[in-house]
A protein has these predicted regions:
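A Zn2+-metalloprotease active-site environment signal
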Residues: 1-209
Length: 210
């Protein structure tokens, strides 16, 4: 709703003004191409979900990433969209990643995690309208992006439904998981999934007939 959208924009502004995010180096044409491909796919899979896709760059281990913020903001980083030498994604795999993040948006996982990890701070922000103070609390925000296994299952299930709604199989997501697993463990895995639990279990769930 409105307060989540305002809060999400404050969080993005905080990340932009700090050391975490910088402007995307992808060409405007490439950004527009990805956004234009994702928009009708999202509309088919979740016509009731409002989102905003933004592109940013980052350095270090977090550079290969995509994540959702409150209010439907989905951030796609250059390291994932353009490759960083460790992982090269097809456009279908990028759409699967964005579908996964749209699942987090649909199920409001970030706000639910904020309530779980910092319920008092969230309650005070809602009561007093102090979203800026909460948005500036990096520890709280990073905790909210560490999803539970159940939340990841929900987002994976949505990603599969997203792909199928657009005439695709779960293969792009499965292929991505296999690529990441081949990077020889969490010390080399990109941030997009290095913090997501039970990668092998998630592959098996996607392969199971449902």
């Amino acid at each position: 709703d409105g307060f989540e959208q305002r809060f999400g924009q404050m969080v993005l502004d905080q990340m932009d003004s700090g050391d975490f995010l910088s402007p995307s180096t992808l060409s405007p044409e490439r950004q527009a191409q990805l956004a234009a491909r994702f928009a009708p796919m999202a509309a088919r899979a979740a016509p009731d979900v409002r989102y905003q896709l933004v592109f940013r760059n980052a350095d270090g281990p977090a550079a290969v990433n995509a994540f959702a913020l409150p209010g439907g903001i989905i951030v796609l980083l250059d390291g994932l969209a353009g490759g960083d030498g460790r992982l090269t994604l097809t456009d279908e795999q990028l759409m699967a990643v964005l579908g996964h993040e749209l699942g987090h948006v649909k199920h409001r996982h970030v706000m639910r995690r904020l309530v779980q990890t910092a319920g008092t701070a969230v309650g005070a922000a809602v009561l007093w309208g102090d979203f800026a103070g909460l948005a500036a609390n990096a520890t709280v925000l990073l905790g909210a992006l560490q999803y539970t296994r159940d939340f990841e299952r929900e987002a994976d299930d949505f990603a599969v439904a997203f792909l199928r709604a657009n005439g695709l199989t779960p293969s792009p997501l499965l292929d991505l998981f296999r690529q990441i697993e081949s990077l020889s463990g969490g010390d080399r895995a990109p941030a997009f999934l290095s913090t997501h639990p039970a990668l092998r279990e998630r592959q098996q769930r996607l392969q199971s007939p449902r």
